[in-house]
Amino acid sequence: MLPFFPEPSLSYTQQNRTAVLLLNLGTPDAPTAQAVRPYLKSFLTDRRVVELPKWLWYPILHGLVLTLRPKKSAHAYEKIWFKEGSPLEVYTARQAAALAKRMPDLIVRHAMTYGNPSVADVLSELKAQGAGRLLVIPMYPQYAASSSGAAVDKVCEQLLLQRNQMSVRTVSRFYDDTGYIDAMKNHILRYWAEHGRGKKLMLSFHGVPQKHHDLGDPYPDECRHTAKLLAEALELTEDQYVVSFQSQFGRAKWVTPSTQDLFGKLPKQGVTELDVFCPGFLADCLETMEEIALMGREQFYEAGGKSYRYIPCLNDNPDWIDALVALAEENLGSWR
């Protein structure tokens, strides 16, 4: 039997507060190989992320990936690290702080599925503050088992250890949420007004293995639906935007088209002015700031591109905070 964690002895009225948890993927504590290795290990041993039997995957993971990749990843993190810390952690913390300011009757916190602040630590803190109800918002508009599913798993793992369990609601997806779409539209239009506009807009989402989609993961379909709604809001014709998937890992077939492949192909097709936005990322991170903003620019120019603009994520954009407040209010329902 699992041991239950000791909990504060609080009366019902003392456990009647409502909390909102913004849950993102995670980040190492520092841009060093020593910090990256345990982060990668926790991420890549999650059965939601790598759906291979342990006997096959673990020798590869421990023999190759965790030996070679930490140093390479640490170098990439060094390029984008803020003075305050990891961009993903910094921006997610700002989102939580902005939400807390708008909803002062609630306890609002953020946590990471992998790394710090951990779900275990934050839920313990919330329990100590008298939270008996918890709304979990995984910061992924489009549902994928390897992101949203893994985030909810972490919360459920902690519920298994609670003697007096919290009431929990989760937001599984919001890929077609009007506030989310409008926030992106306004953000992109403001960027174009200030920095100019390319001939084509690339909407790059994080990729998933094709097998995941074949087995029922709705993620690629939800990404394409988000892109369609955003393109319509921006009044783009079909030839003015393209949907792609980035961050492939390993040798398995992933959903296509590949963002990296398109960086090489588009200039040869006459597209030499490109803007790139990542709708599935609500906060800038390694995959957007290094892979797209830096490496993507280099790949596009090497292929013959002439103009490349990376449009930052929503981060703590006021329109996105408005949408986040509305999303929380809708899902809190009678808890408010």
UniProtKB/Swiss-Prot annotation:
Q: What Pfam families does this protein map onto?
A: Ferrochelatase
Q: Which reaction does it catalyse?
A: heme b + 2 H(+) = protoporphyrin IX + Fe(2+)
One Gene Ontology MF term: metal ion binding
The record, for CDD domains, names: Ferrochelatase_C, Ferrochelatase_N
User: Which BP terms from GO are recorded?
Assistant: heme biosynthetic process
Enzyme Commission designation: 4.98.1.1
For whether the record's keyword set contains Lyase, the answer is yes
Sites where the protein binds Fe cation: H206, E287
State whether keyword Lyase applies.
Answer: yes
Q: What class of enzyme is it?
A: lyase
Keywords assigned by UniProt? Cytoplasm, Heme biosynthesis, Iron, Lyase, Metal-binding, Porphyrin biosynthesis
User: For this UniProt entry, what's an example GO CC term?
Assistant: cytoplasm
Identify the InterPro entries for this entry.
Answer: Ferrochelatase, Ferrochelatase_AS, Ferrochelatase_C, Ferrochelatase_N
Pathway this chain belongs to: Porphyrin-containing compound metabolism; protoheme biosynthesis; protoheme from protoporphyrin-IX: step 1/1
Tell me where it resides. Answer: Cytoplasm
Recorded hits in Gene3D superfamilies, A to Z, give: 3.40.50.1400
Query: Any idea what job this protein has?
Result: Catalyzes the ferrous insertion into protoporphyrin IX.
Q: Which family does it belong to?
A: Belongs to the ferrochelatase family.
Protein name according to UniProt: Ferrochelatase
Which organism does this record belong to? Neisseria meningitidis serogroup B (strain ATCC BAA-335 / MC58)
Q: What is the lineage of its organism?
A: Bacteria, Pseudomonadati, Pseudomonadota, Betaproteobacteria, Neisseriales
